[in-house]
């Protein structure tokens, strides 16, 4: 084979590989929009200190997906009040977020009790079923199911779980969960930055059952136990 023919063959092969890579990117990455983003910015002027209310729940399973044994979060739509399987939400810059998390999952001892300390919220407290607490010690009492942690804003919230044996033996079996199942109600507030940006949040309890060290699966998948808060101006 002559040199020009070999060069032409290599160019054709290179273009074919490039075309294949482009197809994969477009059809398998860009075509997938991922979980929706719930918008809490309507009728709120950014950077005025106004407040928005975000309601979430964590569930011990995800029966609305093809991974029913994965633990997950849901966000309640501010427009329809339906539970949406997503962990992405949008809030105004320079505002106060009043968050409520319904804790339907059972207790899991924290690997490191540092995740049981509340940080980054208004007053560095949360309200568990109406009771103000600054620490949940999962080593002395099985009282924590998951966490809501946003490292870039210094936020760490241990999400309380039902503590009784009876409650932990009768957890919600279909998601999204309903108030008839054992649960806790965790409330707290935090302030958003005045500068727009994307802030990653996740659960710090290794709850990916069946994955190495519990850190795979739902723990690293947007829409389950990790997500993004979009702060918009």
Description of each model-found segment:
Residues 18, 22-31, 123-233:
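Extracellular/periplasmic metallocenter environments
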Residues 1-140, 150, 233:
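Extracytoplasmic entry segments of secretory-pathway proteins
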């Amino acid at each position: 084979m002559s040199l020009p023919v070999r060069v032409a063959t290599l160019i054709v092969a290179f273009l074919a590989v490039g075309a294949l890579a482009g197809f994969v990117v477009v059809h398998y990455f860009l075509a997938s929009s991922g979980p929706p983003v719930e918008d809490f910015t309507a009728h709120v002027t950014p950077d005025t200190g106004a407040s928005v209310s975000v309601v979430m729940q964590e569930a011990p399973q995800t029966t609305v997906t093809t991974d029913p044994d994965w633990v997950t979060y849901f966000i309640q739509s501010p427009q329809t009040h339906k539970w949406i399987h997503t962990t992405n939400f949008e809030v105004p810059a320079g505002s106060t977020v009043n968050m409520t998390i319904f804790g339907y999952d059972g207790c899991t001892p924290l690997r490191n009790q540092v995740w049981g300390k509340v940080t980054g919220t208004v007053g560095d407290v949360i309200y568990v079923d109406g009771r103000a607490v600054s620490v949940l010690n999962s080593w002395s009492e099985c009282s924590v199911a998951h966490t809501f942690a946003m490292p870039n804003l210094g936020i760490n919230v241990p999400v309380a779980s039902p503590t009784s044996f009876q409650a932990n033996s009768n957890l919600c079996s279909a998601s999204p969960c309903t108030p008839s199942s054992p649960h806790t109600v965790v409330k707290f507030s935090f302030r958003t930055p005045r500068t727009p940006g994307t802030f990653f949040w996740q659960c710090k309890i290794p709850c990916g059952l069946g994955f190495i060290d519990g850190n795979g699966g739902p723990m690293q998948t947007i829409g389950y136990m990790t997500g993004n808060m979009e702060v918009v101006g």
